[in-house]
Amino acid sequence: MDADQEKDLQKFLKNVDEITNLIQEMNSDDPVVQQNAVLETEKRLLLMEEDQEEDECRTTLNKTVISPPQTAVKSAEEVNSEAFLASVEKDAKERAKRRRENKVLADALKDKGNEAFAEGNYETAILHYSEGLEKLKDVKVLYTNRAQAYMKLKNYEKALVDCEWALKCDEKCTKAYFHMGRANLALKNYSVSRECYKKILEINPKLQTQVKDYLNQVDLQEKADLQEKEAHELLDSGKNTAVNTKNLLETLSKPDQIPLFYAGGIEILTEMIKECTEQTLFRMHDGFSIISDNEVVRRCFSTAGKDAIEETVCVSVLKLWQAVCCGNEENQRVLVMHPDRARLLATLLSSKVLAIRQQSLALLLQLAQTESGRSLIISHLDLTRLLEALVSFLDFSDKEANTAMGLFTDLALEERFQVWFQANLPGVLPAVTSVLKTDPKVSSSSALCQCIAIMGNLSAEPATRGHMAACEEFGDGCLSLLARCEENVALFREVIYTLLGLMMNLCLQAPFVSEVWAVEVSRRCLSLLNSQDGGILTRAAGVLSRTLSSSLKIVEEALQAGVVKKKKKKKKKKKKK
């Protein structure tokens, strides 16, 4: 065997080894290895096709006499090699075809699983996702979806396994890291959970806000876990307050007692809640459910026209919730995340009983003191109903009105609230417009200013401003409130100043509500130019700068008033002869 034949043989044997390895990898149970083998096979086939094309196009010319004649007969090794590669090519094409068919089936099973998941049939969803993975093993979304279903069934270990498989399919799968973070959090692997969430941020820095929330959840749960351990230790040691808290909750769990029995017991319990230990024991022994699920207590809350005893029960419960939630973020979470209690909080803020409204407002204001508390309110309460209730406090005393507007301000500064406000503005606008119909002589001026300032800040966003400017009733409300305040500029100076700021924003929107509206606004502002107040003067001029151009008539009125002066033509000097 000459050197060339030896070289061809070695090349053939090398190809056989490589192709054998590829076939073994394509039959691997690991979807990632399998996928890489398919890609490598396709690459080899493409190179082989290019080599064949070169051979077909190549022309050999040899004019030397001593060159031996070329044989047309291929060696046995070449024939075997080509036949083997042809077989591999055929197998790869068949596999590609089967893969396409299986992809269609896997997608259909994924959709079935999603439907079952949406209906709460998590076992069925898992079955469909598993069938999809039997068709195609390297579909990451099937793993992450199945992991989510396992999470719903509290099977956290299986969820983690599926997340690991998803990461083998795609090492940058943020959804897999998210579910891993949640599963580890449920298993109290706090440090591992944090690492999973931080990995999301490394992959996609744009998810910083979400990751911050996830990490905050880990911190809160770890803190709550430590609190419960300490509370258990104190209870086991026989500390009086710990034991008394537990015993009193057991007493209050008795059903079908008279309302005063519960009112008295709740008031005693409230007095006992002094430290974090008692707050934690209240949560650990299911205090929230014992109180809110009690049929007698529920009847007291649901009765429209409450008598003195029912009012006492409701007020005592609200004061208890304030005591157990003060500075305790986990208790706040347990209180607000329960759907029935979340609905109740928004409803009680509109109660006809003043004491109940006051205590509901105090509780919500307490929750809003922390970022997590504000997030709970925005995420779980009926914000439309809450907003309607808050603006209704403008008719109450200065203290209550200012407290309500303080809560409104705290929420309005949150980005999530602003997003919600913009998305739900058509439904919220009537409540906001009602503020402009307030009588400044009766309402708290400081609270009214605060509410209008919030509207001004929200109107800085173009889409929100567009909705406000397009609402004729809102524009007329601004004008009517301005007219009422002009009756005593000195008394309502702050209201006028704040209202002009809102109107300046509205005038950025073109076209205006109407030309008639713009003319009336201009006339009001022209009259305010006589004010001795620098702030009002500046803002009135600012509004005029945006409305004057809308009407020739108002420009003429401004000229007559001397606000706008005509440019005098310069006389040309005659040259001396």
Swiss-Prot record:
Keyword terms, alphabetized: Cilium biogenesis/degradation, Cytoplasm, Phosphoprotein, Repeat, TPR repeat
Compartments, as annotated in UniProt: Cytoplasm
A Pfam family matched in the record: TPR_1
A GO biological process held by the record: sperm axoneme assembly
Residue ranges of TPR repeats: 106-139, 140-173, 174-207
UniProt function note: Cytoplasmic protein that plays a role in the proper assembly of dynein arm complexes in motile cilia in both respiratory cells and sperm flagella.
PANTHER family registered for this protein in UniProt: TETRATRICOPEPTIDE REPEAT PROTEIN 12 (PTHR46540:SF1)
Protein name: Tetratricopeptide repeat protein 12
Naturally occurring in which organism (per UniProt): Macaca fascicularis
Highest classification ranks of the organism: Eukaryota, Metazoa, Chordata, Craniata, Vertebrata
Primary gene name: TTC12
